[in-house]
Structure formats: structure tokens, C-alpha cells
């Protein structure tokens, strides 16, 4: 055989060429391929058949299959005038996979892949080659046991590609975050001030409780937890508790939502409707003194005013002459204004007096109708509560 003929036999196909052929024989550790246009058969070692680990070539090919591969080496035996092309199907699959993944990365697209293995540091997935989802990129939530993903097909995004080091990093967390953001935006657009909705207590702080209302957290300030004075949120709610809340305000730009639990609850006054009536004599506790009278709590959260003229039969200059906060007293209900939630009381009417003088109806009428010049303001009525309130 001449040197020219030998060169013609081996130079038609060279290393790096991409070739196609038909599988002629499947052996234990390799596959024999008839190369289209080639002078020799091709050999694909088992390690170069797939990007995945296989125990037998028959797992991925069979006789008669058409395959495509790169030529990694041309072997020629001059003495016997025989040769073979050493091929890599794996190299071609990897190249195609990187090209596909690069396109998805450039376009920020979501792909689906099956989890083939769960390891200590994350998830191994099949993306045409071995891809890895690190533990930190699996979810926006804490997941204690990654084995729940074993065998599942998950939605992921390409985070990083490094072909030189055969490195493919993927993120399931990025997909979750994108979906959560879309849900949050949709929810924010659907909410309106005044809506009463269900929520769950997510976390507590010194100044209030954050409520999960379906993917978005809103704040219930400590002053909006109850009609009664609350020192700390833990007195009223606990993490994980289901609650009803009313939307007080929404700032869609900053995604800040102000909520109220108090506004969904009956007021203390509503709770006592039908319990008290005019002319009833009941017990109460003096909670605050003002220059025009004394505020007496007759039920939890319900206070009535004893005008200074209704404190004693004798003339007094200030309520403090005969009363002090915390003092228990008997009071007579002079009037109830349900619409404005006001109660007019009298201590004098419960006290014996030789010269009994009927309570002045004009005093009661003025308080209930808010006509007296020195009638208490909202600040007068809840001043102590505001002083004690920790913001």
C-alpha cells in the first residue's frame, strides 16, 4: 500500500469533525457505528455515550439507531491497513445542552428538569447534562428535608454557566420569587381600603403584629389590636393565629398595608347593649379625673362621665376633693346615647341626703348632646390611655 493511498484513507475524516452513522453492534463497553462517508467504523466508548452515568450502552442505544458524534481520534494500523474513528456522543450532547441553556439564561426563561439525585448540598437535575441546584437556591422558604424533591420535575432558571469547568448552576428559588411577586402584585391590585379579609399572624414586634394576607404582609399597629389598652401584641395574638383584619390604608408603591383587628370587633359599648338601662344603679371604678367631672369605668372598656355637679350633694370645687383614680363607687345611669356611645352617670343620686335634690336634667342633656361649654373632648376621655400607650 502506497503512502499516498494511506493518507487518502485517513484524511477524509479528521479529529473534531462531526459525523453521523448507524449503530451496527452494541457491546458491553462500547458501540460500533458505521460512519456515513467514512472508510472505517466508529467506536463510541461507554463513557462517551451519554452525559449521564450508564451501566450498559444498551440503556441509551440499540442496533439500527442513527447517532451523531464528534471524532476525538483517528486510529490507523498501517501494517494491517485497518483503522477506526474514536467518537464522543457525550461531547456533542454537552455542546447542545450548553447552547440551549445559554439561550434560556440570555432570555431569563424558565425550564423544567427532573431531579435525578438529592445530595447534601442540594439537588442534581437533568438538563441534557448534569445540573446542580444549591440548597440556597431551592426555595424562598426553609425546607428541612430535600428528599421531597427526589424524582420530581421542577421549574428552574439558569443561574450560572461555566462550560470550561463543566459547571451548570440552576435556581428554583428564582422561579418561586417571580411567581410570588406576580401573586403579590395581583393581590395588591385587588385590595381596597375598608375591606375585611382573613389573615394569619406571621410575626410580632414591639409596635404591632405583621399579618400574612395571602402572600403580602400588613401591619396591625399595637393600638389597632384591641379596643382595650394593649401593652404588647402577645397579650392579644400569637404567631400562626387566624384573624380577621380590616384594611385601613394601602400604599401600592411601597407595598405597605395598614390593618386593624380592632375595627373588626364589636366596640365595648356594643357589647353592653341591653345590659344597662337608665336609672340602673351599678358599681364602677374611677379611672380619671378632669376639671369638669370624673370618668368611671362601668364595664371593660366602657366609661361614663359623672359631671362635677353629679358627684356630691354639697358644692365641690374639683372632683379630686372627694374622688381619686381607682376608687370604687356606685353610680346611677342618667342617660345612654347609643349612637355616640356616651353614658351620663351620677354618684350623687346614689347617696343619701336629707334635702334630696333631683338631678338636673339639663346637665344630662348637655353631656349627651354635647352642648356644654366644658364638655369633655375625645382627648379628655382617653387622655390617660394615650399617656400610657407605648408607640
Swiss-Prot record:
GO MF entries: mRNA binding; structural constituent of ribosome
**BP GO terms, sorted:** translation
Q: Which CDD domains match?
A: S1_RPS1_repeat_ec1_hs1, S1_RPS1_repeat_ec2_hs2, S1_RPS1_repeat_ec3
Q: Which GO terms describe its cellular component?
A: cytosolic small ribosomal subunit
Per UniProt, the keywords (alphabetical) are: Repeat, Ribonucleoprotein, Ribosomal protein, RNA-binding
- Which segments constitute the S1 motif domain? 16-90, 108-173, 194-262, 279-348
Its family remark reads: Belongs to the bacterial ribosomal protein bS1 family.
UniProt cross-references to NCBIfam families, sorted A to Z? PRK06676.1 (NF005208)
Write out the function statement from the record: Binds mRNA; thus facilitating recognition of the initiation point. It is needed to translate mRNA with a short Shine-Dalgarno (SD) purine-rich sequence.
Q: What is this protein called?
A: Small ribosomal subunit protein bS1
